[in-house]
């Protein structure tokens, strides 16, 4: 499915992929949901997340935290508080370090709590996104705080694209767990 360029497509792709993500998770045996990722998963790609995330919980809290980034960024800027998407001191070159800090923050978060947090944050994101028009979501430069991108592009990245990433990793976990 191509990247969303309308509000309707954004909402449909975010909800659709979120539903597919949960179908995949709910289809896993409890034992596999709670199992650590196989060591070979760390070798599946060059991106930092392949070595960072050790289990399903780590991935779910990552998605949750990126929802929080999106929500806080939009809410702050709408309230007139000029804020970048990534919190200080991070930028787009250093955000992998931020992801590690987010990972550390949740090492004692139980899987069941991670699941409920993610479901609640997805709903909060969807509730906020529905308040914007097509123009507000997909017109470059409409909000000065989105820089050279659009609000919709940030939303796609924090929802549908991130859910695709999670499904890819979960499928790899299932495959390596059932060998």
Q: Where on the chain are the PLM-derived regions?
A:
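Aromatic-glycine hotspot motif
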Residues: 1-57, 65-179
């Amino acid at each position: 499915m191509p990247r969303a360029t309308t509000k309707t497509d954004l909402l449909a792709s975010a909800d659709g992929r979120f539903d597919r993500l949960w179908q995949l998770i709910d289809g896993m045996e409890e034992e596999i949901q709670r199992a650590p990722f196989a060591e070979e998963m760390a070798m599946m790609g060059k991106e930092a997340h392949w070595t960072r995330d050790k289990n399903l919980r780590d991935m779910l809290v990552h998605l949750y935290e990126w929802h929080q980034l999106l929500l806080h960024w939009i809410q702050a800027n709408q309230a007139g508080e000029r804020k970048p998407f990534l919190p200080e001191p991070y930028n787009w070159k250093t955000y992998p370090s931020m992801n590690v800090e987010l990972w550390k923050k949740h090492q004692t978060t139980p899987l069941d709590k991670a699941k409920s947090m993610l479901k609640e944050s997805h709903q909060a994101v969807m509730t906020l996104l529905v308040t914007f028009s097509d123009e507000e979501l997909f017109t470059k430069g409409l909000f000065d705080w989105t820089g050279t991108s659009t609000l919709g592009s940030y939303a796609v990245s924090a929802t549908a694209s991130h859910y695709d990433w999670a499904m890819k990793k979960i499928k790899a976990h299932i495959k390596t767990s059932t060998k």
